[in-house]
């Protein structure tokens, strides 16, 4: 996670630098271009007015005269263009008239005489272009500069992300240690209460204590699961799995639970959808999603469960009728211990279940998302199918 955070920092830093540099380069280039054209126009205007080159020989200027019969005579040509190109271009420039001073790569000035003859001074700006070798050198130095900036950004990211990494590591360690420490006393409380239940049967206070200790045990187990999932170096047993079979096994268990809740669980499962993953974690995803759908669906409703293979992915979808949730609720559905603050969902709380499901899916290089279609809440999981994985993708 912290490696990804450092990469995002470098990417964001480099993106901002590149945008700023490109903007400054564009502004500087446009500024220089404007003054180059302005200086060039002053020169050609002076040449055309005096009817004489009268400037150093390295300036890329051609001086031509055109008589009243439109016959072109080249007085001098100090450009890289041929005389034929100069002649044709001169006639084109004459058509443009005095109002314009630029045509294509030419800056020009026209002096008209009373006998309808013309003197045209032409400067070819293309001759000012940076040579290819120099351009290539500039490109190499630019790339080298950006690579150097990327290396510096990566180095600095350690100091920026480091404190966050330290604090989060301490937090995870605290959660893990606290969860382990709480397991023993809670188990002892539950055992003692069960003994009391045998001695005082039917006591609703003892029943409530047993129920709450069970809930605490599940919560602690969820916290430990999240702690293990956050630690990417923890060992997992990835292998080839028939997701279709796993779905059928889990559905068989939850069909009776749905029936008890007076809800109907319908499934459409495509045969032989294979993935690579850790079997217990994949089952945990299915259990979390089905449990969530049954608990949060409306009474006497139908829950749709489907599995198919498309676009080199296994696509698992669970939808159920539900209240209409706000965008804020949908955006935070996978946040840990998210408590909805919504008029239609004032008692909605998802705990850690969906957070664990998201962590497992991401560990399997997949994607999970939630969206609503009218009164249907739909959860969709996408996992890479077998054959799309490589060994290097497995942590």
Swiss-Prot record:
One cellular component term from this protein's GO annotations in UniProt: plasma membrane
Taxonomic superkingdom: Bacteria
Pfam families referenced in this protein's UniProt entry, alphabetically: HATPase_c, HisKA
Domain Histidine kinase: residue ranges: 177-387
Transmembrane residue ranges: 9-29, 136-156
Reaction(s) catalysed (UniProt annotation): ATP + protein L-histidine = ADP + protein N-phospho-L-histidine
SUPFAM superfamilies the record matches: ATPase domain of HSP90 chaperone/DNA topoisomerase II/histidine kinase, Homodimeric domain of signal transducing histidine kinase
Alphabetical UniProt keywords: ATP-binding, Cell membrane, Kinase, Membrane, Nucleotide-binding, Phosphoprotein, Transferase, Transmembrane, Transmembrane helix, Two-component regulatory system
Gene3D superfamilies: 1.10.287.130, Histidine kinase-like ATPase, C-terminal domain
Protein name: Sensor protein DltS
């Amino acid at each position: 996670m912290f490696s990804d955070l450092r990469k995002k920092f470098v990417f964001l830093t480099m993106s901002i630098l590149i945008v700023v540099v490109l903007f400054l380069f564009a502004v500087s280039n446009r500024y220089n271009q404007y003054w180059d054209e302005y200086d060039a126009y002053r020169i050609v205007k002076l040449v055309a007015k005096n009817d004489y080159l009268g400037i150093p020989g390295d300036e890329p200027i051609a001086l031509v005269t055109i008589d009243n019969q439109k016959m072109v005579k080249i007085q001098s040509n100090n450009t890289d263009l041929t005389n034929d190109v100069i002649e044709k271009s001169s006639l084109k420039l004459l058509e443009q008239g005095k109002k314009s001073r630029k045509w294509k790569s030419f800056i020009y000035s026209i002096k008209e005489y009373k006998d309808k003859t013309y003197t045209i001074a032409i400067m070819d700006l293309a001759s000012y272009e940076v040579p290819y070798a120099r351009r290539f050198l500039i490109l190499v130095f630019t790339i080298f500069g950006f690579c150097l900036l990327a290396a510096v950004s990566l180095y600095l990211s350690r100091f920026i992300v480091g404190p966050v990494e330290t604090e989060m590591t301490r937090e995870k360690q605290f959660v893990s240690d606290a969860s382990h420490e709480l397991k023993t006393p809670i188990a002892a409380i539950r055992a003692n209460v069960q003994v009391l239940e045998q001695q005082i049967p039917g006591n609703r206070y003892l029943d409530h204590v047993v129920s709450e200790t069970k809930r605490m045990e599940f919560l602690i187990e969820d916290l430990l699961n999240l702690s293990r999932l956050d630690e990417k170096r923890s060992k997992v047993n990835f292998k080839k799995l028939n997701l279709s079979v796993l779905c059928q096994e889990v559905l068989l268990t939850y069909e009776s639970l749905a029936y008890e809740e007076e809800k109907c669980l319908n499934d459409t499962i495509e045969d032989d959808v294979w993935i690579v993953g850790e079997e217990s974690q994949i089952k945990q995803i299915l259990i979390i999603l089905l449990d969530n759908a049954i608990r949060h669906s409306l009474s006497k409703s139908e829950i749709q469960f489907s599995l198919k293979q498309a676009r080199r992915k296994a696509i698992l979808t669970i939808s159920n009728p539900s209240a209409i949730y706000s965008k804020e609720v949908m955006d935070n559905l996978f946040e840990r211990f998210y408590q909805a603050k919504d008029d239609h969902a004032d008692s909605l709380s998802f705990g850690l279940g969906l957070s664990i499901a998201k962590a497992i899916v991401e560990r399997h290089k997949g994607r999970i998302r939630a969206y609503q279609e009218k009164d249907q809440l739909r959860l969709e999981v996408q996992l890479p199918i077998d054959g799309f994985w490589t060994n290097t993708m497995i942590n």
